[in-house]
Amino acid sequence: MKPDIHPDYQEITVTCSCGSTFQTRSTMGKPLHIEVCSVCHPFYTGKQKIVDTAGRVEKFRQKYGKKVEKQPAAG
């Protein structure tokens, strides 16, 4: 392996918009500001909204689905 070709790997502070901070290592070399982290992300906090797509599926079927025609009674 060649010496002195890799960038410096330094410890930096990551700050979230919610105010949470943590330390990590990066070649960036300066503090990093992020919008969402594991403290405030809806997936990790349990405040995730589940989108009900049943209405969309029914709307699609009405628009593009095959229409079921009544068959004449045998007799």
UniProtKB/Swiss-Prot annotation:
What InterPro entries does UniProt report for this protein, alphabetically? Ribosomal_bL28/bL31-like_sf, Ribosomal_bL31, Ribosomal_bL31_A, Ribosomal_bL31_sf
User: Which residues bind Zn(2+) per the record?
Assistant: 16, 18, 37, 40
Has UniProt tagged this entry with the keyword Ribosomal protein? yes
Matching entries from SUPFAM superfamilies are given as: L28p-like
**Which keywords describe this protein according to UniProt?**
Metal-binding, Ribonucleoprotein, Ribosomal protein, RNA-binding, rRNA-binding, Zinc
- GO biological process: what's one of them? translation
Cofactors demanded by this protein:
Zn(2+)
Kindly state one GO CC term assigned in the UniProt record.
Answer: ribosome
Family the entry assigns: Belongs to the bacterial ribosomal protein bL31 family. Type A subfamily.
Organism of origin is Nitrosospira multiformis (strain ATCC 25196 / NCIMB 11849 / C 71)
Describe the protein's quaternary organization and the partners it interacts with: Part of the 50S ribosomal subunit.
Q: What is this protein called?
A: Large ribosomal subunit protein bL31
Q: What GO MF terms are annotated?
A: metal ion binding; rRNA binding; structural constituent of ribosome
Q: Which Pfam families match?
A: Ribosomal_L31
Q: Entry cofactor note text? A: Binds 1 zinc ion per subunit.
Query: Per its database record, what is this protein's job?
Result: Binds the 23S rRNA.
Q: Which Gene3D superfamilies match?
A: Ribosomal protein L31
